[in-house]
UniProtKB/Swiss-Prot annotation:
Organism this protein belongs to: Xenopus tropicalis (Western clawed frog)
Family: Belongs to the anamorsin family.
Region feature (Fe-S binding site B): 275-289
Pfam families for the chain: Anamorsin_N, CIAPIN1
Keywords from the UniProt entry: 2Fe-2S, 4Fe-4S, Apoptosis, Cytoplasm, Iron, Iron-sulfur, Metal-binding, Mitochondrion, Nucleus
UniProt name for this protein: Anamorsin
Cx2C motif 2 (motif): residue ranges: 286-289
UniProt gene name: ciapin1
Ranges for region Linker: 179-223
UniProt cross-references to CDD domains, sorted A to Z: AdoMet_MTases
Length: 313
């Protein structure tokens, strides 16, 4: 039988789990000794591992939780179970977990390696995961593993580990007491330096102060608007033996000049009258007349139409 003095102490509130493979007589004996160990102020709560998530225990309810330590228990504790244990443990509380492990397991195997179990305890919010013991299985226990879990490897053993919940609630926060920053005093200003860089109105009118006139910095040539041809690079578009071609990303205006030469100028032609009565007004104009809507005009008078009116007509 386990040395309960290393698992629990007097006055603690303890939860112990069991499953369908646990020995009923061993469970009763183990719980009885637990109650003696935590008496007179402590209590022992017995939970079926499959119902632990449904028990709805309050946060930080137990000083210690014992998982799989009852003789005959073959449970493999899921990450959800471990997270629930971390929730119901008090800050600083401990969990003792005992389960079957294998040295080398394939993906999809029901068992885990000792390293994987230690990692899951840490991911659940527990710390200081340490191994207490590791024992090989008896032939009868190996046969039970094959029947219950379907694992036929010869590298199965029983491992017991202990982990603790940190001395604070998971997700809790606390304000940091940072040292107050010292207020830097402004350095005194040297009045001699201020006077050196300060110009008064009298200084501006002083004949001894040589001030530059910004208008005198430019001559007449600088003020002339540049001709586009003067902005072109040397040899840009020149030479009768080659076709004029603008540079890539042209900025001198040659590209626009060549584009204008390619596009022929289109001057809209005056629309002729088909009936000769257009000048009389809308009353004498047909429905498709381009002069429809315009005032009457003298015969032979030149009237220019907007290209938009020609398209509408």
């Amino acid at each position: 039988m386990d040395d309960l003095g290393t698992l629990v102490s007097s006055g603690q509130k303890v939860a112990v789990t069991w499953d369908g493979s646990s020995s009923k007589d061993a469970l009763k004996e183990f719980v009885s000794k637990l109650q003696e160990a935590v008496a007179p102020q402590g209590t022992v709560s017995v939970e079926n591992i499959e119902r632990l998530l449904l028990s709805a225990h309050a946060d930080s309810s137990f000083d210690a939780v014992l998982l799989g330590v009852v003789q005959g228990t073959q449970s493999v504790h899921s990450s959800e179970i471990l997270a629930e244990v971390a929730r119901i443990l008090k800050p600083g509380g401990a969990v003792i977990i005992q389960e079957l492990v294998a040295a080398g397991v394939d993906k999809g195997s029901p068992l885990r390696t000792p390293e994987r179990l230690s990692s899951l305890l840490k991911l659940s919010g527990l710390t200081e995961a340490t191994q207490l013991l590791q024992e090989p299985l008896s032939p009868e226990q190996k046969q039970t593993v094959v029947e219950l879990l379907g694992y036929k490897g010869n590298d199965v053993s029983t491992i017991r580990m202990k982990a603790k919940k940190p001395n604070y609630e998971l997700g809790s926060s606390r304000q940091l007491s940072l040292p107050k920053s010292k207020i830097t005093e402004k350095s005194s200003v040297d009045q001699a330096t201020v006077k050196l860089w300060t110009l008064s109105a009298n200084d501006m009118n002083d004949e001894n102060v040589d001030l530059l006139d910004s208008d005198e910095l430019l001559d007449q040539e600088d003020l002339k608007k540049p001709v586009p041809s003067s902005l072109r690079a040397s040899g840009c578009g020149e030479g009768s033996e080659k076709k004029r071609k603008a540079c890539k990303n042209c900025t001198c205006g040659l590209a626009e000049e060549l584009e204008a030469e390619k596009t022929p100028s289109t001057v809209p032609k005056a629309a002729p009258s088909a009936c000769g009565n257009c000048y009389l007004g809308d009353a004498f104009r047909c429905a498709s007349c381009p002069y429809l809507g315009m005032p009457a005009f003298k015969p032979g008078e030149k009237v220019l139409l907007n290209p938009t009116q020609l398209q509408d007509a």
